[in-house]
Structure formats: C-alpha cells, structure tokens
Amino acid sequence: MKRLLLYLLAACLSTACGGRTAVDRLIGRVTEGTGDRIVTRIVRQADTLPDYFSLYDEAGRVVVEGDSPVSVATGVNWYLKYRAGVHIAWDGLTRPLPAPLPPVGEPVRREASGDLRYYLNYCTYSYSMAFWDWPRWEREIDWMALHGINLVLDITGMETVWYNLLLRLGYTREEAGRFIAGPAYLAWWHMNNLEGWGGPNPEAWYDERVALHRRILGRLRELGIEPVFPGYAGMVPRDIAAKIGVAVSDPGKWCGFDRPAYLSPDDEAFGRIADLYYEELEKLYGKANYYSMDPFHEGGDTGGVDLGRAGDAVMAAMKRANPDAVWVIQGWQDNPKRDLVAHLPQHDLLVLDLYADKLPKWGDPDSGRCDPEGFWGHDWIYCMLLNFGGRGGMHGRMERLVDGFYDARESGLGGRLRGVGLTPEAIENNPAMFELLCELPWRAERFDPRAWLSEYLRARYGADDADAAAAWALLYAGPYNEPTQGTGDGAVESLLCARPGLHLQRASTWGNAVPTYPDTLSREAARHMLAAAARLDRAPGFVYDLVNTVRQALADRAYALHRELSEAYDRGDREAFAASSARFVALGYAQDRLLATCPGFRLAEWLDAARALSDDPERRALAEWNARTLLTVWGPRDESGDTVLHDYSLREWSGLLATLYMPRWERYFAELTSRLEGNAPREIDFYAMEEAWTRRTDTPSRSGADPVATARAVFDEVFGE
C-alpha cells in the first residue's frame, strides 16, 4: 500500500500529468527548449531520510525522480553530464539536448550525505555579481539547482533595508546614502569593514534593487532553495552616537578604511534597533530560516565589548524575528570567537568552515588554522573558498578537497557536519573544481579524483580524447593539486598583471606569483590541447579550456622572462635587459590578443554590465568607476600614500592587459633603461597612473577572430614553434 501511495503521489507530481513544474521550466531554459523529453517526478519523504535522486528509463523516456525540486534538478544535471554528454557551466549555461535522447541504461540512485549544500560568499556579490541583471541571475539560479544548492547567501537589495532603517532612526536621505557603499563595495559594507566607499547610490537604486531581489527570491523559493538573509550583528554608522546618543565601540580600521561603529550589547538600543532592522527586512522580503552575521570580521577590535553578551544579543534578536531561525557564521581567520558563540544552543548556529580546501578549522591536524575544539559542538559545513578577488589562474587542490571531505566525515566532528559549501570570493573560473565539490555529498565512498576527472572530461568535451587527457594529467599534477603550505591565497598570479618591480614574488598583498610546478608543464599541457583541437573544437567547454590553458602557459612563461630581465638589470646588462623586457611586453600584448577571443576573459563584458545598470549618464559613470576601481586601486590612498588592496582583484583580461597592465610595465622598463644609461632615478607614482585609468570611459575592443586559430598562433609566436 505504501508503495502504491508513493507511486500515485509521484504520478501527480510528474510532468506526465500535464503540469509543468518549476524543475520542468528550468530544464526548458537550460536545454534551450529541448527538455520536454525528460520526465521529472518529485516524491516527498520524511525529513529524516536523506535527499536523493534516481534516473531510469520508462516507456522510451528518461525519468528523473527525487525528493525535492533541487534533488530532481541535481539528477537532471547528473544525467546531462554522464549520459547525454552535456555540460552546463559558466562558459555555457545553456545547451541543447542531443537527438535522439540517450537512455539512462543502468538505473542510477544517489543519496546525499548531509542535508545542506551552501553557496556564495559576501565577496562574490562584489567581485562577480555587482552588476548582474535578472537574466543573468536567472541563469545562475538554474546553475545552483542543477548543482544541488539548497542554501544560498542572499544579500541583493538588503541595502534598502538599511536605508529605510536609518530613516526611521532620524537620518536624512542624504545621510543614509553616505553610509551605504557603492554597487561594487556592498560586500565589505555588509561585513562591517567600511562605510560609504563607492557611493552614494542614486535614490532610484534602492527601489530597483528591491524589485530585482523579489524576482531572485521568488525563483529561489519556487525551486526550494533556502535564502540566507543578512541579520543584525550590531553594525551602526560611525556618527550614530552623536546622532541619537547610543553607546558604541570603535572596531578600528580594515585595510585603511574606518569600520562602522559597533553598538554595545549592553545598551538597550541594541535590541530596539535590531528589532527595527528585522521589521524593515520582513516588510520587503518576508522572513528567512537562516540569517548570516559576522561580528568583528577580519580583525575588528573587540575592546570594551563583552563577547558573550554580544553573542546572546545577536541570537536573541534573530530569534525574536523568527524563533526557528539559524545563525550562519563564517569560520574565517580567528572567527568565530569562542567567547562569542561557544555557549549558544546547539543547532541554532551553523559555522561555515570557509577555507577547508586549504586551511580547515574543523580539526585537521595538518592545517595551520586547526582549532582542536572544533566548533564547540555546533553544526558546520565543509567549504571550498578557492578563489580570491576574482584573480584568474588554473588552481585547485583536488586530492586535498576530496580526502579532506571524507576525513571530516569520519572524524569526531563528522556527526555535526551538515554538508558542503561553495564560498569563493569570485565565480566563473575553474569549473572543474566547482563541479568536484558539488558532487562530494552525492558520492558515498571516497574516490580517486583522477578517475573522476576522466568522467568529467568526457562530459565536458562530449568524447574521450587522448591529447585532452594528457593535457589534464599534467594540469592535475600541477595547478590542480597545489601545495597547501606557503603558497599565498588563491591561484598563482600572473606577473603580467603585477604593479611593476624586479624579482617580484607576488602581484597582490597576500598572493603568490611563483609557480609551484615547472613552467614546461603548462606549456606541454597547452601543446596537447592544441593537438586535441582538431577533434574537439566544436565543444564550447573545450574551447574555453584551450584558451585558458594557453593563457596559463603564457603567464608561466612571463614569470620566467621576468626572472631573466631582473637578473639582467642586476648585472647592468643593457642588451640582455632590453631583449628580455621586450619579449615580456610582446608576450603581454599577445596574451591580450588571445583573451579578446573569449568572453570569459574580457574587460568589455564587465564594463558593459556596469553601464547597463542605467541609461542616466551620471549613474552609468558611477557604476563604471566602481567597476574599474575595484579591479585596480580598490580604495583611496591611505596614510602611506598607497593602498594595501591595489591589484587584489587583478584580472588577466583582454582590455586590462592592453590599456593598463602593459603600459604600466612599458613605463617602468623605460625608467629602468634610463637608469642603466646612467640617468638619475625618477620615481613612478603607479597609484596615480591607475587612478587615472579608473576615470576612463573607453570600451576595450572585442575580437571576432577564431579562438582556436588565435591560440595556436599566439602559442607559436611565444614559444617559437
């Protein structure tokens, strides 16, 4: 009888009954209208049972069954990858299905370990999503569901909540606007790191963001993806004590910026302002079951703050807004602080082990950030951070990522492990790593990443290929299994994008530009990809990977050339310096020419998205300045006359190379040549050069050239083949 009831329920929820569900509409979007040959069935089950999906053939049709819309969407993606040879990734978020539709064959059933699959970092909203419109958001939400995401940080339009809150506290519209950051800097404003920078936003911005967020939220809820709203953590404007007479502490500075003030949890105003915040939030967007709060993020001064009282105040305010809500907090650097959260009730706090792919906090004894106490009995999520600032480069730790997850599951903290999370500072890079992380909870047993990679390549390229496999075997041995110790944060940086200097070891303050593998490795990988192009050049994923592999080979060659020119200058060898520096510059412009053929590596797309926010010239100018500034100087000059964050968000993009990075190097090489000729040194104010670039309004060109032919020509030009 139970089986019969389940069958009837499945039949009612099946597309075979004629109704198009949210998942069916998703399938239609991602398959460009060819998805009506897939039947979906949602079979609800008890919450105590694991999420699942199953694939099977029935009466000549492919059936995807699961316990929720997200589980079914995950199953659809599994079928697309491993049966249909269709890979949905950022370099191609829609693909038509093949005809005839390949059968499932041997039925597939997968169950998830853990009930949560989390997505996004505050920084992602600035480094990747700052200028997205609804069509781009719609495609991303489809990507989320296909990859099993059921819990997502959701901060779009939350500045309007604050705007309305400040008006209720007696601020004028102008004063409220001065507190809120500009479109590219909202992430750090939300995390209590800065106020006002990049703004003020125009009045119309706030209503527009509400409208956009309501569409986002509606789609998330339609697919059963839980939003994580920013909760109230105690942030207030620095001038609030003078404005309304409340007790605050000064958390100090963050990377040269004055942080917002922190409202004392001992002041009765904490509860009152928190309640007003949640009231305004609910007016616009309703309640959430999860709220994200990170007091004292990245070194905020806690002097004079009773951390235990602060944790209680934050939790109590959230529970007044929704008694069933869970506080989500980032496990990052020295947060969460023990005194803030250790005493809080279990299951009311969820800790994101944000950098578990390199420096896990969960208890791995090999980690430099291991906390032997784990998370004090609180629930937690195993996360992959991977990317910093949107800085490009092939990068990952496949073996560490896989083994770390299963080690965590089998550890003493495994009982509190709720699932996995993607927490990159930027997306639209290294698709293999994101795919790998998303599959971890659906694979019951520990597995060899090399075997997984073979399956991934078959799905991504639509066929097996010996040269492509050889290329990726090299990449697996190099950039996709980076060491965990002493290599900086994120991908190995390209010195083409660095502020000029000699003997450089990094391009950004916390980065690393020294390859951890021989530069011949990426060159040989590129050679294999070029050999495979004759067979695979119709696969969009292959074309992106080919361009990226040749890009990596050129970036690695640039490091070797930089070492040569540095040594030549040290020797005073004018001829050798001239030759090496000329090759370095020529390589940079060749890189620009290559990347102009691929949308994922072009500045033009980033600037176009910023300009598209409005037809109003002043608003367009503000958005473009935000877009350009974030990638270059990041912030204003500090007391040193510079900024520690310059080039933190460097991008090896066509348009940036040709209009800023290479002219910057050419200016520097001209100065060094002058010094070698015996002239007095002249200092170059690189900040001034970069700041002038942020005020430009020209559009970098796009190339209509064939990316495969260009990759081959550039490779031959640089490596003399």
Regions found by a protein language model. Give the residues of each.
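Sec-dependent signal peptide recognition
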Residues: 2-7
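Active-site-adjacent substrate/metal-binding segments within catalytic domains
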Residues: 114-133, 144
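Hydrophobic h-region of N-terminal signal peptides that target proteins for export
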Residues: 9-17
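C-terminal substrate/ligand-recognition segments
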Residues: 512-534, 547-570
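Extended, compositionally biased alpha-helical segments that mediate assembly or anchoring
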Residues: 653-721
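Catalytic-core regions of glycoside hydrolase
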Residues: 35, 87, 91-101, 120-124, ...
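Contiguous, structured surface segment used for ligand recognition
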Residues: 17-114
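Surface-exposed, polar/charged faces of alpha-helical domains
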Residues: 538-545, 549, 556, 563, ...
